[in-house]
């Protein structure tokens, strides 16, 4: 009998694409599925509840407040009954065979920690993400793979990063690692989880035979909240995981030089950076308690 996979679909204020996301899971050929929709409370929570009510086999977790991406996914992980957990969002639709392809790989490779499909833009069909590689150097570098690299072909390949909106893992591993960090709320939480998975001795793998379609976000600048957490959580990730030799140069670059330049050019964004640094400073005792200085392998960016 196929192992039970719990599919967690996180939803926040987007009832329209949620139906397609649920249907794409139900239509998977994989025979043993447990589906959980987690609603982060919003003004559209009632509409989301109505969508979920159309699918009797789907379990519904309604958070009393918006816990962000990290907290919402953690609520889904806590509710999961499966031996394996696939994390997804309401704006992601699985292509046929997606779960079966990932499960076939994960079951055969005990050293694989996180497995992810290739993520495509739904409108254009172009590759949005096939994973990525990064380096926690004085200047942060993250390279997202948006096309197949020479020599990769259709076979699974190792990466260092996969987006949190489409991850398959063993439930035991996610629970041992305590899922995402709740204090990250949103943005960079997937990067930080990937680092912990790698440091635990597991691999992060992209399976090209598996694919998902991502609904294109509406055009426009990121909100102040998004910018704040994107900056804050990158700084926090360095405190948690970067080599000690890197931290002075990183703080000088991003905490002094970049902040000063940004305040002069764009005061609004500059003060967001100041707030982000202050938040990290106030969280320093907890971050330093959780710090794991073990090195990562060279990123080969």
Can you annotate each of these PLM segments?
Residues 159-167, 175-206, 210-213, 222-229:
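Donor nucleotide-sugar recognition loop
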Residues 85:
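Short aromatic/hydrophobic "clamp" motif used to bind/position activated sugar donors
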Residues 63-80:
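Glycine-rich, basic loop-to-helix element that forms the pyrophosphate-binding segment
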Residues 204, 209-212, 222-247, 270-287:
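Catalytic core of nucleotide-sugar-dependent glycosyltransferases
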Residues 23-32:
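Short, acidic, metal-binding catalytic loop of nucleotide-sugar glycosyltransferases
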Residues 245-301:
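Non-catalytic, C-terminal membrane-associated alpha-helical segments of glycosyltransferases
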């Amino acid at each position: 009998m196929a192992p039970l996979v719990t599919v967690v679909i996180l939803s926040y204020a987007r009832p329209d694409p949620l139906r397609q996301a649920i249907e794409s899971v139900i239509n998977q050929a994989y025979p043993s599925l447990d589906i959980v929709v987690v609603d982060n409370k919003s003004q559209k929570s009632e509409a989301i509840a109505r969508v979920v009510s159309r699918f009797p086999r789907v379990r519904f977790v309604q958070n009393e407040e918006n816990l962000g991406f990290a907290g919402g996914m953690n609520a889904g992980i806590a509710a999961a009954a499966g031996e394996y957990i696939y994390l997804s969002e309401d704006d992601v639709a699985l292509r046929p065979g997606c779960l079966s392809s990932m499960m076939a790989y994960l079951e055969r490779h005990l050293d694989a920690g996180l497995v992810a499909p290739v993520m495509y833009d739904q409108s254009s069909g172009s590759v949005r993400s096939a994973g990525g590689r990064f380096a926690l150097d004085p200047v942060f570098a993250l390279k997202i793979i948006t096309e197949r690299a020479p020599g990769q072909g259709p076979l699974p390949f190792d990466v260092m990063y996969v987006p949190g909106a489409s991850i398959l893992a063993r439930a035991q591993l996610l629970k041992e690692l305590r899922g995402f960090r709740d204090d990250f709320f949103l943005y960079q939480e997937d990067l930080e989880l990937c680092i912990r998975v790698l440091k635990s001795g597991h691999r992060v793998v992209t399976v090209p035979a598996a694919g998902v379609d991502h609904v294109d976000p509406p055009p426009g600048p990121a909100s102040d909240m998004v910018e704040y957490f994107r900056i804050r959580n990158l700084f926090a990730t360095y405190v948690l995981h970067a080599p000690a030799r890197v931290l002075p140069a990183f703080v000088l670059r991003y905490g002094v030089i970049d902040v000063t330049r940004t305040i002069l050019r764009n005061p609004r964004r500059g003060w967001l950076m100041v707030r982000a640094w202050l938040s990290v400073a106030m969280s320093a005792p907890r971050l330093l308690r959780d710090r794991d200085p073990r090195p990562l392998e060279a990123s080969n960016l």
